[in-house]
């Protein structure tokens, strides 16, 4: 069950869940505000809580508004695309064979069948990014499992509109945003550690922060670096 409350010019979506504490989040790219509240919490208490966070909400929304956006993809020759933080110029090749993506020097060669439209080109490139992300993530999981004393049961990779990653701590699964394959490797490693830390502490509380401080002392540097990079043009914070 959910409702929407107004805080002056700001609207917040409230979702009632079987939880003990209230949580408030601001999501990119538009600064959408979402509040997760205990099932029986009074709406006036929720409003008071949200009002107490107004200054922080506005600060986060301002950061998101100032964050650079990638231009919409048109899949044209010499269009810029990124892989692990490096810029490549796109080259479209039409050939009557299985679609593929290849990196050569500073060029990304996207091979598609003759007549392929933009949707098909995007599908081929998205599938390639997913595969690159999986290949890079599995070694990181293997590295951090013994260091953190946790076990990741399954890894999922898909396009996510509001998060870099998520964790199902009960099932032991983590999910990563395909967009991470466009960012520097150290940013991916930070998100992997962040999500694996949720296997030890599922809330964003002081204990969770202490875990990040312990396992990755420079985590705030990597978080800030990631959130300062251009985000995808579509509607999609750590």
Role assignments for model-derived ranges:
Residues 195:
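Walker B catalytic acidic pair
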């Amino acid at each position: 069950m959910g409702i929407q409350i107004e805080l002056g010019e700001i609207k917040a979506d409230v979702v009632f869940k079987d939880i003990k504490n209230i949580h408030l989040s601001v999501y990119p790219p538009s600064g959408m505000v979402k509040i997760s509240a205990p099932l029986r919490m009074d709406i006036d208490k929720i409003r008071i809580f949200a009002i107490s966070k107004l200054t922080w909400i506005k600060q986060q929304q301002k950061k998101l508004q100032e964050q650079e956006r990638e231009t919409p993809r048109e899949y044209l020759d010499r269009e810029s695309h990124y892989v692990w933080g490096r810029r490549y110029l796109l080259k479209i090749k039409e050939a009557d064979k299985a679609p593929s993506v290849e990196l050569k020097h500073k060029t990304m060669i996207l091979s598609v069948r003759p007549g392929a439209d933009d949707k098909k080109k995007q599908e081929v490139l998205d599938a390639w990014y997913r595969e690159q992300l999986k290949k890079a993530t599995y070694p990181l999981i293997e590295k951090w499992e013994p260091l953190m004393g946790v076990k990741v049961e399954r890894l999922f990779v898909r396009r996510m509109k509001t998060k870099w990653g998520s964790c199902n701590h009960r099932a032991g699964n983590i999910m990563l945003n395909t967009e991470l394959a466009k960012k520097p490797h150290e940013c991916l490693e930070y998100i992997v550690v962040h999500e694996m830390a949720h296997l030890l502490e599922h809330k964003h509380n002081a204990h969770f922060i202490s875990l990040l401080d312990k396992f990755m002392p420079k985590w705030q540097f990597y978080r800030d670096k990631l959130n300062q990079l251009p985000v995808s043009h579509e509607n999609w914070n750590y």
